Amino acid sequence: METKPNPRRPSNTVLPYQTPRLRDHYLLGKKLGQGQFGTTYLCTEKSTSANYACKSIPKRKLVCREDYEDVWREIQIMHHLSEHPNVVRIKGTYEDSVFVHIVMEVCEGGELFDRIVSKGHFSEREAVKLIKTILGVVEACHSLGVMHRDLKPENFLFDSPKDDAKLKATDFGLSVFYKPGQYLYDVVGSPYYVAPEVLKKCYGPEIDVWSAGVILYILLSGVPPFWAETESGIFRQILQGKLDFKSDPWPTISEAAKDLIYKMLERSPKKRISAHEALCHPWIVDEQAAPDKPLDPAVLSRLKQFSQMNKIKKMALRVIAERLSEEEIGGLKELFKMIDTDNSGTITFEELKAGLKRVGSELMESEIKSLMDAADIDNSGTIDYGEFLAATLHMNKMEREENLVAAFSYFDKDGSGYITIDELQSACTEFGLCDTPLDDMIKEIDLDNDGKIDFSEFTAMMRKGDGVGRSRTMMKNLNFNIADAFGVDGEKSDD
């Protein structure tokens, strides 16, 4: 059931058919979220007044034919799975000259981890219900010939704030149709959840069970099973690290739960338990196997900390990159000009592709797209000069004291010596990061809990490797970026 390009489809369209105008049928409301490609809005159907979610994807972000095919495949897969009770149901698709719109069921109950944290208590028995749902989605995907490839907590939402809300899988942007026995080779997913065979670039549907096993480990302990200060360190742990069942809270967790995790996080895909077999495991089937006593509150606090990505750090890196001296930047300015052939001040996908070809690179189009995604901090579809420098400069230049002072001052607009929530709001607006939970962002960095960030807290954040990457593909995380592609030596000493 492989998706094939439709030969009759015009080259600048995603859908192989014409559609009515979205606004003739729906009223667009508030923004619900921002993804790598699209923005999701609340929308209301005019004829019924029913609320839905509308994911709007700007076509300017679809820079190559492969991107158009990816969106069309995502739509097909959503239709393919739409009868499953724990998959967000697609309502319809619309396309005009500027956007592709996917209208789907709206989920107003929040993300998986956020819901657990806000409840304030959690038990193994509750974890059973959640992982049973997740494994049920995986089993359904595999039985219908679909590999999800990006299972992570952010892709599971509750359909309502009620206690009996259903957990639903969303975002099939990396999902693919596959045939039994077929292997895939492109490295995609999210660092903590990726299976070892993905890193080895030869894998099948078993990767989804691994990712579900990682989610289960985090649900019960509040931390990922394979962790390191850097993303390359995380990958080393995934390939070689031992599962920790000795430190808290594992001594208090049932043996049955640990046995299931062992079987889901088996490194050999051939020996790994299938989704169906996992659903038949005693911990899931036998109600008495999973205790109902609350887990240690420390698990919840760790879970909250883990689920917040550090967005301030990304903004700060770009601020630093833009203030470095000509000498520190070296030949990067000339390289940027060489790639930016129309002198627009931004690099498009086509310019990046042409620039790489000129320096003799033999990267595939999908790999060049990966570099683009990794460098494009504000998801604009192009790389500006600041983003280019942030992607190509070595970190030890970024972390020098005077650069950290300058970045701190950028946020600390009134020079008070602290970054406040209002100043953070202002910076997020400038960077186009709307609807970001600022309270959580500050709490993550605010070590003395005074509600603001001082310079020492800011410096500690900048020098800590958080490894929380969410790139569409992970070439950047596999120690490969634009600097490598152009042969730039970003690691020269700063002497």
UniProtKB/Swiss-Prot annotation:
Ca(2+) 3 binds at D412, D414, S416, Y418, E423. The active site is at D150 (proton acceptor). Residues 290-320 are annotated as: Autoinhibitory domain. GO terms for molecular function: ATP binding; calcium ion binding; calcium/calmodulin-dependent protein kinase activity; protein kinase activity; protein serine kinase activity; protein serine/threonine kinase activity. It holds the Pfam family EF-hand_7. Ca(2+) 1 binds at D340, D342, S344, T346, E351. CDD domains: EFh (cd00051), STKc_CAMK (cd05117). Ca(2+) 4 binds at D446, D448, D450, K452, E457. It is an enzyme of class 2 (transferase). Interacts with Di19. There are 3 contiguous domains conserved in the CDPK subfamily: a kinase domain, an autoinhibitory (junction) domain and a calmodulin-like domain. The autoinhibitory domain (290-320) inactivates kinase activity under calcium-free conditions. This is Calcium-dependent protein kinase 11. The gene is CPK11.
